[in-house]
């Protein structure tokens, strides 16, 4: 057992003294001997469905409200085509999970195309790849069914397919089509499904759980949008924490993220009211998260519900014997993930298409239990979940959802980790620079969420402050094992939290990378396995640094949190050449957004003289020197 207590960061006074230093030449000497080990999975991703980052974001399904899910189903995103009307039909369920379908009533004298359209999530990105659509239909009909992608305002057709299908009024039957597309100039595209009005005249047809997918990342069925997945792949992150976040907690025990309702066929997933103002289809479910990890080479970090909902919602926290069914539910989930096919839940996983167990090594118990009334009971709840999980799976790393000592057991179990979150102002993040210098080295840290807060878009001042914070924890990456910026993704048409790392609209190529994205990319792509000692003639502030090595390669990361240029000499014995990547702007408020890209990194080759590199770092800058 390991004792644990709270620690404080640097004082405001010391921060002020750092910030008022004048620019002058700074000399850094990197030792090529010794050093501390650095976590090989330091940089990664935290994901939850916020800002339509899942549905309408990285998840490849392009139709909004595809199954009319929810306790109060509606026709959001749907409209009728031709001489027909549509309505919600609760008397013709597709499955027990999808109790409502769309009823299409066709006029007695209808001719031409009649049917329904879907507007997607503020549009549909048509990228020129092969598309596929599926749907369930019930009703007496035998004839052509056409699926089209058509400009909302222009009427331009970007792809279509027609099939002949026969359905009856007795049962739903499924149909699917594949068709080539031409790239649309923007996201103003509608999905249109129509039947022959003259054949269907005077009748009613029901449609259930419709899907539309373009190309997916690595051609994964029910997979990710490649445009966004590629941007994440470019960062070379090491882990993915899922499914949240607040969206794991829900607003009550009943409303929590339920793993067993996110698996199997899409039409067997009821979805849930998410905690970020919109309904989640759960098409991006447990299997899809693990395939995301598999396809991007990420270590999965699974969050499990621990008896506490947001702001103590739904009479939570749950304690004592009342926790037992929720602990059992987590054990069932872990058997589903890790069990072989001789187990009940391992066999269920195999029946759902995944024969081999997944490689899960880390589980986080709850989310931010220090907030909203969760702290007082968390030590009890954490211990109950820890004891049960550890007994069944002793090799799993179990992570507490907070690092606040008042919320944790007096003695943390050997091998457990804690999770530290920090949303702050730029000065606040810089003020935490040496917080990690003072940690007890026996309790590993996961920095599960951090970023500069309360601004629309990441700007240079905020991104440099994040770099200072990152330099602080990378210097201590023997004990800080993982860290993730949050939130990760943002559909600009529906945003609940800013700033975010990556923004997008539904135009096919409309992805904009923030200044903070570039900082994350620069730091993640340039990693050593050993943190090196650096000696200097200057104190930290406004210039901050960390150095690491991997074999004969050295990486020096720098942040200039100030308005004056810094002249540097960086000595690394034995090196002769390097690549210098710099992200900088004299305007601390400069930012990238959906309307402008003002700041991008620049790269240059630099030569050393007797192992010493000489260069200047502009105001409000982040840089990485990769030398060998």
From Swiss-Prot:
Q: Is Cell inner membrane tagged as a keyword?
A: no
User: Pfam families from the xrefs?
Assistant: Alpha-L-AF_C, ASD1_dom
GO cellular component entries: extracellular region
UniProt protein name: Probable alpha-L-arabinofuranosidase A
Q: What gene is behind this protein?
A: abfA
Look up the record and give one Gene Ontology term from the biological process aspect: L-arabinose metabolic process
Query: Reaction catalysed by this chain?
Result: Hydrolysis of terminal non-reducing alpha-L-arabinofuranoside residues in alpha-L-arabinosides
The EC number of this protein is 3.2.1.55
Q: Which residues does the record list as glycosylated?
A: 36, 51, 74, 152, 171, 260, 359, 493
From the UniProt record, give the pathway where this protein acts.
Glycan metabolism; L-arabinan degradation
Chief subcellular location: secreted
GO MF entry, a single one: alpha-L-arabinofuranosidase activity
Family classification = Belongs to the glycosyl hydrolase 51 family.
The record's InterPro entries line, in alphabetical order, gives: Alpha-L-AF_C, ASD1_cat, Glyco_hydro_b, Glycoside_hydrolase_SF, Glycosyl_Hydrolase_51
Q: Where is the signal peptide?
A: 1-25
Q: Which UniProt keywords apply?
A: Carbohydrate metabolism, Glycoprotein, Glycosidase, Hydrolase, Polysaccharide degradation, Secreted, Signal
Q: Where in the cell is it found?
A: Secreted
Function recorded in the entry = Alpha-L-arabinofuranosidase involved in the degradation of arabinoxylan, a major component of plant hemicellulose. Acts only on small linear 1,5-alpha-linked L-arabinofuranosyl oligosaccharides.
At the top of the EC hierarchy, this enzyme's class is hydrolase
């Amino acid at each position: 057992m390991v004792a644990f207590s709270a620690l404080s960061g640097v004082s405001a006074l010391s921060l002020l003294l750092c910030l008022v230093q004048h620019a002058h030449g700074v000399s850094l000497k990197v030792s090529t001997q010794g050093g501390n080990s650095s976590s090989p999975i330091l940089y990664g991703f935290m994901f939850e469905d916020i800002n339509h980052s899942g549905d309408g974001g990285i998840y490849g399904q392009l139709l909004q409200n595809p199954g009319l899910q929810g306790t109060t189903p509606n026709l959001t995103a749907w409209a009728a085509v031709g001489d027909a009307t549509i309505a919600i039909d609760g008397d013709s369920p597709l499955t027990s999970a999808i109790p409502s379908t769309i009823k299409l009533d066709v006029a007695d004298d209808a001719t031409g195309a009649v049917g329904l359209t879907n507007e997607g999530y503020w549009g549909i990105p048509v990228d020129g790849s092969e598309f596929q659509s599926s749907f369930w239909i019930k009703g007496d009909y035998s004839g052509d069914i056409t699926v089209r992608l058509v400009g909302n305002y222009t009427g331009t057709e970007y792809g279509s397919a027609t099939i002949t299908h026969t359905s009856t009024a007795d049962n739903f039957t499924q149909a699917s089509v594949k068709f080539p597309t031409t790239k649309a100039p923007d996201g103003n595209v509608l999905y249109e499904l129509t039947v022959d009005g003259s054949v269907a005249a005077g009748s009613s047809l029901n449609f259930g759980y419709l899907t539309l997918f373009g190309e997916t990342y690595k051609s994964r069925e029910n997979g990710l949008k490649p445009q966004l997945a590629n941007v994440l792949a470019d960062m070379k992150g090491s882990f993915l924490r899922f499914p949240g976040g607040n969206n794991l907690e829900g607003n009550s025990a009943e409303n929590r993220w339920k793993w067993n309702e996110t698996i199997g066929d899409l039409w067997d997933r009821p979805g849930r009211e998410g905690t970020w103002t919109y309904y989640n289809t759960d098409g991006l479910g447990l299997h899809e998260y693990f395939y995301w990890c598999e396809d991007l080479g990420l270590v999965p970090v699974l969050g499990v519900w621990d008896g506490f909902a947001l702001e103590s919602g739904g009479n939570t926290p749950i304690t004592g014997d009342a926790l037992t069914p929720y602990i059992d539910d987590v054990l069932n989930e872990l058997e589903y993930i890790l069990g072989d096919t001789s187990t009940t839940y391992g066999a269920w996983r195999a029946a759902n298409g995944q024969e081999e167990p997944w490689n899960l090594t880390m589980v986080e118990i709850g989310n931010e239990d220090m907030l909203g009334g969760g702290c007082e009971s968390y030590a009890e709840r954490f211990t109950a979940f820890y004891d049960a999980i550890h007994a069944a799976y002793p090799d799993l790393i179990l992570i507490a959802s907070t690092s606040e000592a008042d919320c944790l057991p007096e003695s943390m179990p050997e091998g457990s980790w804690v999770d530290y979150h920090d949303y702050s102002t730029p000065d606040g993040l810089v003020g935490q620079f040496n917080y990690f210098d003072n940690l007890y080295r026996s309790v590993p840290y996961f920095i599960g969420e951090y970023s500069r807060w309360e601004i629309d878009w990441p700007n240079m001042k905020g991104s440099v402050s994040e770099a200072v914070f990152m330099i602080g924890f990378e210097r201590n990456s023997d004990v800080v094992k993982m860290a993730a910026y949050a939130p990760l993704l943002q559909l600009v048409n529906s945003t609940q939290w800013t700033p975010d790392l990556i923004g997008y609209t539904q135009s096919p190529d409309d992805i904009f990378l923030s200044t903070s994205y570039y900082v994350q990319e620069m730091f993640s792509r340039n990693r050593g396995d050993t943190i090196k000692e650096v000696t200097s003639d200057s104190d930290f502030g406004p210039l901050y640094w960390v150095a690491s090595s991997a074999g004969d390669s050295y990486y020096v990361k720098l942040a200039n949190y100030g308005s004056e240029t810094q002249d540097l000499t960086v000595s690394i014995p034995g090196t002769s050449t390097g690549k210098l990547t710099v992200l900088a702007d004299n305007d601390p408020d400069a930012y990238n957004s959906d309307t402008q890209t003002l700041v991008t990194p620049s790269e240059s080759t630099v030569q050393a003289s007797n192992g010493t590199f000489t260069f200047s770092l502009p105001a409000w800058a982040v840089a990485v020197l990769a030398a060998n």
